[in-house]
């Protein structure tokens, strides 16, 4: 369990690796062009973000799940049986078990001046690059409860006990704060296929207040 949490914390850190360069590149591109297409439009809109669509198996899991709330943030998910509470703080939320997987959510509060749209576009571009390199098997814009973000699923790890993740990153304005939301569902690579429907059902059940 500690190994999975350590790897997940590392992934949060790696999310920001090279992000400064991506921000500069996207910012430069935006300043030099007055036109846009599907790869460069502002991430504040929702037109280019898909909405979750559950399979039959995922719907069954979600229908039988129990809602769990993150009191300090107002966010909630529906969790199946076997996903106990581990640790919940103001900016972190951890539920799960080695048998089924882990839900690891974190909040990062950004300055009001932080370019959230540009940052999210850079995250998307970086994820597409990982997709090209075979490190991710799925990348898309995904709207969760009215919040646009980037969703990706990692490719199988080289070893069976390596960590594999289903992840989503987005931004919201909440109680006067500009917040980055980082949601990770993870388990060992050999268990991922068995849990992937549960991971999707959990992620897509997310309710995100904006105020």
Predicted features, each with a name:
Residues 96-122:
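A short acidic-to-branched-hydrophobic micro-motif
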Residues 5-8, 15-102, 162-163, 177, ...:
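N-terminal targeting sequences that direct proteins away from the cytosol to non-cytosolic compartments
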Residues 125-176:
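Signature of long, low-cysteine stretches enriched in small and polar/charged residues
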Residues 108-114, 139, 188-192:
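Second-shell loop/turn segments in exported
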Residues 82-85, 108-113, 170-173:
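A short, sequence-level motif marking secondary-structure junctions
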């Amino acid at each position: 369990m500690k190994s999975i949490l350590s790897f997940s914390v590392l992934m949060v850190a790696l999310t920001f690796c090279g992000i400064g360069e991506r921000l500069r590149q996207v910012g430069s591109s935006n300043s030099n062009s007055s036109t846009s297409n599907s790869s460069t439009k502002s991430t504040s809109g929702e037109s280019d973000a898909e909405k979750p669509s559950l399979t039959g198996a995922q719907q069954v899991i979600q229908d039988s799940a129990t809602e769990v709330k993150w009191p300090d943030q107002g966010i909630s998910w529906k969790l199946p049986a076997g996903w106990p509470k581990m640790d919940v703080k103001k900016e972190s939320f951890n539920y799960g078990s080695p048998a089924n997987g882990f839900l690891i959510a974190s909040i990062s509060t950004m300055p009001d001046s932080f370019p959230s749209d540009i940052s999210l576009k850079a995250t998307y571009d970086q994820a597409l690059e990982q997709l090209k390199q075979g490190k991710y098997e799925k990348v898309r814009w995904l709207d969760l409860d009215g919040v646009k973000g980037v969703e990706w699923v990692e490719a199988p790890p080289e070893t069976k006990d390596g960590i594999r993740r289903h992840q989503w990153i987005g931004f919201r304005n909440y109680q006067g704060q500009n917040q980055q939301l980082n949601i990770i569902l993870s388990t060992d690579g050999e268990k991922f296929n068995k849990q992937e429907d549960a991971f999707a059902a959990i992620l897509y059940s997310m309710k995100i207040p904006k105020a």
